[in-house]
Amino acid sequence: MEAKAVARTIRIAPRKVRLVLDLIRGKNAAEAIAILKLTNKASSPVIEKVLMSALANAEHNYDMNTDELVVKEAYANEGPTLKRFRPRAQGRASAINKRTSHITIVVSDGKEEAKEA
C-alpha cells in the first residue's frame, strides 16, 4: 500500500532539492525525519513537511502503521520559472531565472494491495 504527498511551486531550485531527497530515498520514515532535522539545507524543512504529510495521509486515509513505512519514491520536478531581469552596464539587462519545484514523496509499507480482476 502506498500514500503520497505533493508540494507544488516551492521557491527552491529542483537541483538543490534533489540533493536532500537523495539522502532520504529508500530509508525508514523515522530515519528520514532524523536525517532531515540534521541536514543544513534550505529545502530540508519543506521536505520534512511533505514527508510528514505523506505519513499523515498513510495513517488517516489507508490505516497504515507509520512505524513500518519506508520512503519508496522521492523526486523533485521543475515548476514554473519566474523570469526577472538584472540591470547591467551600458543600459543592458541580464535574465535571471528564479526556479521553482514540485516535490513528491511516496511512502509504502512494502505490502502489495490486492488487485481486482
Swiss-Prot record:
InterPro entries in UniProt: Ribosomal_uL22 (IPR001063), Ribosomal_uL22_bac/chlpt-type (IPR005727), Ribosomal_uL22_bac/org-type (IPR047867), Ribosomal_uL22_CS (IPR018260), Ribosomal_uL22_sf (IPR036394)
Complex and partners:
Part of the 50S ribosomal subunit.
Record's SUPFAM superfamilies?
A: Ribosomal protein L22
Q: Which GO terms describe its biological process?
A: translation
Tell me the function of this protein: This protein binds specifically to 23S rRNA; its binding is stimulated by other ribosomal proteins, e.g. L4, L17, and L20. It is important during the early stages of 50S assembly. It makes multiple contacts with different domains of the 23S rRNA in the assembled 50S subunit and ribosome. The globular domain of the protein is located near the polypeptide exit tunnel on the outside of the subunit, while an extended beta-hairpin is found that lines the wall of the exit tunnel in the center of the 70S ribosome.
Q: What is the lineage of its organism?
A: Bacteria, Bacillati, Bacillota, Bacilli, Bacillales
Kindly give the CDD domains that the UniProt entry links to this protein: Ribosomal_L22
Q: What is this protein called?
A: Large ribosomal subunit protein uL22
Q: Name one Pfam family in it.
A: Ribosomal_L22
Origin: domain of life: Bacteria
